[in-house]
Amino acid sequence: MITDPIADCLTRIRNGYLSNILIIEIPYSKIKKNIIKILYNQGFISSYKIEKINNYKLLIKVALKYNKYTGTSVIKCIKRISKPSLRKYCNYTNIPRVLNGLGIAIISTSKGLMTDKIARKKKIGGEIICYIY
């Protein structure tokens, strides 16, 4: 049984880019889909697709993105911040900058998941899910 499905999702992505795998599969949930959608919009992954398996189970297939010149992954580090055992919250004035603005922080707010830049612009705080750079 998985106690932290978000950490499982991030670990699958991390294991995928460390092993130079092109496509990974993640069990579906709404929050995982929103995290993957943010990664796609920010350019960290090349594509994603939601597929049905056996007419009832959903999977998210994620195509990881690699630098075409060096072959290295676009994602250098993906780190879970708020854990089930220790939640990390911040208001919009204390939202951390990841690598001085080069990376992103995914924040769960009352308006849904969003990046740190959008949360600062909308003046909304929330739970810091992860850092990606």
UniProtKB/Swiss-Prot annotation:
Instruction: State the disulfide connectivity.
Output: none
Q: Which UniProt keywords apply?
A: Ribonucleoprotein, Ribosomal protein, RNA-binding, rRNA-binding
The GO molecular function terms of this record are:
rRNA binding; structural constituent of ribosome
Q: Which Pfam families match?
A: Ribosomal_S8
Q: What's an example Gene Ontology biological process for this entry?
A: translation
According to the lineage, what is the superkingdom? Bacteria
Q: Name one GO cellular component term.
A: ribonucleoprotein complex
Q: Does the keyword Ribosomal protein apply?
A: yes
Q: Which InterPro entries match?
A: Ribosomal_uS8, Ribosomal_uS8_CS, Ribosomal_uS8_sf
What job does the chain carry out? One of the primary rRNA binding proteins, it binds directly to 16S rRNA central domain where it helps coordinate assembly of the platform of the 30S subunit.
**HAMAP family according to UniProt:** Ribosomal_uS8_B
What family does this belong to? Answer: Belongs to the universal ribosomal protein uS8 family.
Q: How does it assemble?
A: Part of the 30S ribosomal subunit. Contacts proteins S5 and S12.
Would you tell me the protein name for this molecule?
A: Small ribosomal subunit protein uS8
